[in-house]
Regions:
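Eukaryotic phosphotyrosine signaling hubs
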Residues: 10-12, 76-80
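Mature N-terminal segment immediately following signal peptide/propeptide cleavage
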Residues: 12-15, 34-35
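A detector for short, charged/polar N-terminal pre-domain segments
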Residues: 1-3
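Conserved short beta-strand elements that form part of the metal-binding/catalytic scaffold
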Residues: 34-76, 114-116, 123-125, 129-137
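A short, Lys/Arg-rich alpha-helix, primarily the initiator
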Residues: 5-9
Length: 183
């Protein structure tokens, strides 16, 4: 008997949203997702590939609190979710699209140390962090991977040291950036 469940991949994510129609416009017009199905005006299922859905949106009641006005820093919960794109050119194209649509870019583009993936993070209409990424290290039977422990420094967060960022680096990393410039 196996000692643990062995998932194949992350299947889908469901977000609670304040305006389901605004969110559908965002995810279809900005990220290019396609609508698979609706449950009346209460829930919608969207996809980017062959699975019926990888994102569900659930309409909150009108009297729900605006959690964007409540600090969630240091609280458990979703930090971000991500979609893979073909290559770095698509990340660059995404920057232009986001800027043209006045969508807040939060961080990137950068290149994480762990996973070596290129990333770009922006906000959806409800303030959730959405990441697109490419070029992540693949771990297969033919390409085994030995886990390592990364030092909590600039290289772990962004191997490019914010040189390609189109926004200011996160405050958390400004001190690490100063230290790396002194070395």
């Amino acid at each position: 008997m196996p000692s643990s469940i062995k998932p194949k991949k992350l299947g889908h994510l469901v977000l609670k949203v304040r305006d389901i129609h605004e969110s559908v416009r965002f995810y279809t017009e900005v990220l290019g997702l396609e609508v698979s199905d609706w449950i009346e005006e209460q829930m919608v299922f969207l996809r980017c590939g062959s699975d019926h859905h990888d994102l569900g949106l659930f309409q909150l009641p009108d009297n729900s609190p605006d959690l964007n006005n409540i600090s969630s820093e240091g609280s458990p919960g979703l930090e971000h979710f991500s979609y893979e794109v073909e290559d770095y050119r698509e990340v660059e194209r995404a920057i232009s699209i986001l800027q043209e649509k006045n969508i807040e870019i939060v961080r990137g583009p950068g290149k994480h140390g762990p996973g070596e993936n290129v990333f770009l993070v922006f906000r959806d209409p409800d303030g959730n962090f959405v990441e697109i990424y490419c070029e992540m290290v693949q771990v297969t039977e033919d390409q085994p991977y030995e886990p390592s422990v990364w030092e909590d420094n600039l290289d772990a967060f962004d191997q490019w040291h914010f040189k390609k960022f189109v926004v200011d680096p996160p405050a958390l990393y400004e001190e690490k950036l100063k230290k790396s410039e002194l070395s």
